[in-house]
């Protein structure tokens, strides 16, 4: 509607943006009754225009195809009576925000703004609350630093969680895990079969466990052993237990549970739980 006005620098485009934005905000706030009245659903497709001089207008779209400037949302009047007024105004505000950006970056593209120009223009625009934020009362946004910190923390947390299953996949154990000799005797052969089905769940649980001595997580090529007293897992190297030595330990006790003597146990068999290296 005002194609003759062509700002050519970042500052001029931003000034154009602010003027159009001010007009649209006025239409949806201070002049809302007049704006509501002009958007008659009985009329043809209507658009809300904002101008650099901070005025606004409800009018038909430009006749030329394609138009000289990007056009705002078409037919905003048709939805007026089919929605709550607050929701309708919010919908118009969202479309107006999109239109303002399209006009600003149309000028940027037309007059050859480079990467730094576009970045600076967007930064200047982004410092202002959107029309939707003004109309909906959400213009008091959180400080950018707080949002960036929250987003960074969330992304970091998601990245860590998604990578954990790949980093902690345990190797298949050569035999089903054995809880202890007493429970096996009570459960009998049937319980051993059921235990085989639960082994995968135990591996998954231990894949998230940290070493009770050094606090590090499980590595796929490391030998681990579990204390049958406190149920904590340890790197074999941290408690000085090798796979060969573990084969001769019936019930393993970590250094804390065995009084600090380096851990161990008596007898033969395979009652302890261990992860192969």
Curated annotation (Swiss-Prot):
It comes from the Eukaryota. Its main location: nucleus. Residues 145-160 have a biased composition (Low complexity). Pfam families: Alfin, PHD. Keywords: Chromatin regulator, Metal-binding, Nucleus, Transcription, Transcription regulation, Zinc, Zinc-finger. Coiled coil: none annotated. Disulfide bonds: none annotated. Residues 259-270 have a biased composition (Gly residues). It is found in: Nucleus. Gene3D superfamilies: Zinc/RING finger domain, C3HC4 (zinc finger) (3.30.40.10). The record marks 218, 224, 228, 233 as: Histone H3K4me3 binding. One of its GO terms (cellular component) is nucleus. InterPro entries: Alfin, Alfin_N, PHD_AL_plant, Zinc_finger_PHD-type_CS, Znf_FYVE_PHD, Znf_PHD, Znf_PHD-finger, Znf_RING/FYVE/PHD. A zinc finger (PHD-type) spans 208-260. Transmembrane segments: none annotated. GO terms for biological process: chromatin organization; regulation of DNA-templated transcription. The keyword Transcription regulation applies. GO terms for molecular function: histone binding; transcription cis-regulatory region binding; transcription coregulator activity; zinc ion binding. Residues 138-206, 255-277 are annotated as: Disordered. Interacts with H3K4me3 and to a lesser extent with H3K4me2. Belongs to the Alfin family. The PHD-type zinc finger mediates the binding to H3K4me3. Histone-binding component that specifically recognizes H3 tails trimethylated on 'Lys-4' (H3K4me3), which mark transcription start sites of virtually all active genes. This is PHD finger protein ALFIN-LIKE 9. It comes from Oryza sativa subsp. indica.
């Amino acid at each position: 509607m005002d194609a003759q006005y062509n700002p050519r620098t970042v500052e001029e485009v931003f000034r154009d943006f602010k003027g159009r934005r001010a007009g649209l905000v006025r239409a949806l706030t201070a002049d809302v009754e007049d704006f509501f009245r002009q958007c008659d659903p009985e009329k043809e497709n209507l658009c809300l225009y904002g101008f650099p001089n901070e005025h606004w207008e409800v009018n038909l779209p430009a006749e030329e195809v394609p138009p000289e400037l990007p056009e705002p949302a078409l037919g905003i009047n048709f939805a007026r009576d089919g929605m709550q007024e607050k929701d309708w105004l919010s919908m118009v505000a969202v479309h107006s925000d999109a239109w303002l950006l399209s006009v600003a970056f149309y000028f940027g593209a037309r007059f050859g703004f480079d990467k730094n120009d576009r970045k600076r223009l967007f930064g200047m625009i982004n410092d202002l609350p959107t029309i939707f934020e003004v109309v909906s009362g959400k213009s008091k946004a959180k400080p950018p630093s707080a949002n960036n910190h929250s987003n960074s923390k969330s992304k970091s947390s998601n990245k860590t969680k998604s990578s954990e299953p790949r980093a902690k996949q345990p190797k298949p154990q050569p035999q089903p895990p054995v809880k202890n000799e007493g429970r096996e005797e009570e459960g009998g052969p049937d319980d051993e079969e059921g235990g085989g089905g639960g082994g995968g769940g135990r591996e998954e649980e231990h894949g998230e466990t940290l070493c009770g001595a050094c606090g590090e997580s499980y590595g796929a090529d490391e030998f681990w052993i579990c204390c049958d007293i406190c149920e904590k897992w340890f790197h074999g190297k941290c408690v000085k237990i090798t796979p060969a030595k573990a084969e001769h330990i019936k019930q393993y006790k970590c250094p804390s549970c065995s009084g600090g003597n380096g851990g161990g146990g008596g007898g033969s068999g395979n009652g302890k739980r261990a992860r192969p290296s």
